[in-house]
Amino acid sequence: SSSAASDVYKRQVYGFEDMFCHTCEQYFSYPVDDNLSDEIAEGIQRHILRSWRACLSDPKDYEARSNAMWDSTLALNRIISRGKEEDWVTHGIEHALSAYTDIAHGAGLAVVHPHWMAYVYLVNDEVTARFARWAVDVWGVTPTGKTDRTVAEEGIDRYVDFLRRVGAPLTLSEAGVPDDPASLDKYADHAGEAGGSFVQIHRDDARAILEACKEPVSF
């Protein structure tokens, strides 16, 4: 049925978003000096995006699906966490959403992850530079004549636009999650001390990120 086909499509989107976010949770963390783990992470992210597009274009493409399985193995087996602090704030906040609603994990990540990025990317120059590097190396942003901030924002914009084009939710309401003040307080209390590498996310930070999730990220 069309409903079943639609559900299968959504599950693919959410699975790929979880893969992509897993690599970012390790990549967007200290240290940000030269290291092989980050180079591998960028390659995995680029390939996840290729597999994602291919699988959505043709769900029966065996080559694309086999690539996606390899993508997911390398995204989730923690090989790219070697030498990295790791972050996992986005997952911590999303788990709070999943604790109180029936939202799919990947759908929650699609909402929270870009908003976490918007919350932390300007914390200091080296973090902004990391987001700019990601924008160039993963999303193909042209950096010539631009500040790191501008490049970083273009990268986050491309990520959000990609999620929009594949049909992922960009806000809590689009994901069917209550976003009234009492609900946001409840999610933030559950997320609590979410940790983090670039920025230590405490309960009130989580609440601010969740508040921002009422609207799509834009600069």
What is each model feature region?
Residues 17:
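Gly/Ser-rich, acidic/histidine-flanked active-site/gating loops
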Residues 20:
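Conserved phosphate-interacting/catalytic interface
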Residues 26-157:
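Active-site segments that bind and position negatively charged phosphate/pyrophosphate groups
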Residues 1-5, 9:
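Single conserved hydrophobic/aromatic residue that forms the stacking wall/gate
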Residues 11, 32, 36-39, 175, ...:
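A short N-terminal beta->alpha junction/helix N-cap motif
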Residues 135-219:
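C-terminal charged capping/lid subdomain of soluble metabolic enzymes
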Residues 23:
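Conserved core segment of the aminotransferase class I/II
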